[in-house]
Amino acid sequence: MYGPVILPGHMKGNPHSWLKKVIEGEEPPHQKIPNDSTSMSHLHDLASLFLAAYENPKASGRYYGVYESWHWKDIYAELQKIFPRMKMPEPITEPAVEPTGFDFSRRDSLGVQMRDIPTMLRETVEWIKSLPFKSD
């Protein structure tokens, strides 16, 4: 889950904890890029999906609450655009697995415009950099 968190303790979870470390100049969590994918969603987008489903009397059943799934090599490539000096994990040497695929037709029927992954990453990093829980 990307985007702002509600409580300071939430900063200890993924992805906020390791993004904060990268902001502070530490290494990312992987020594080698995982040959795997992860599904990503922004907190505000997920909340908007919940509200849209709740307010739609025709909505029923399950809806995917993620934007999409990206391979870790693509996530790290995007993070390198944000953090040009970040030490990159070792690249994968085998063929990359396909990211998890979804049929988003039900999700999209709710009419919620979701942030793409580059925007999600950038906004989350900017939010963490703002030191939201800094006490004076």
Language model regions located:
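Alpha-helical substrate-binding/gating segment
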Residues: 20-63
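Flexible, glycine-rich beta-alpha linker
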Residues: 1-17
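An acidic site on a long C-lobe helix of protein kinase domains
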Residues: 42-46, 71, 116-117
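Conserved C-terminal active-site "lid" loop/helix of NAD(P)H-dependent oxidoreductases
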Residues: 93-113
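Short, solvent-exposed polar/charged micro-motifs at secondary-structure junctions
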Residues: 4-8, 74, 97-104
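Mid/C-terminal beta-alpha module of Rossmann-like enzyme folds, strongest
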Residues: 47-96, 124, 128, 132-136
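Alpha-helical membrane-targeting segments
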Residues: 14-35, 84-87, 92-97
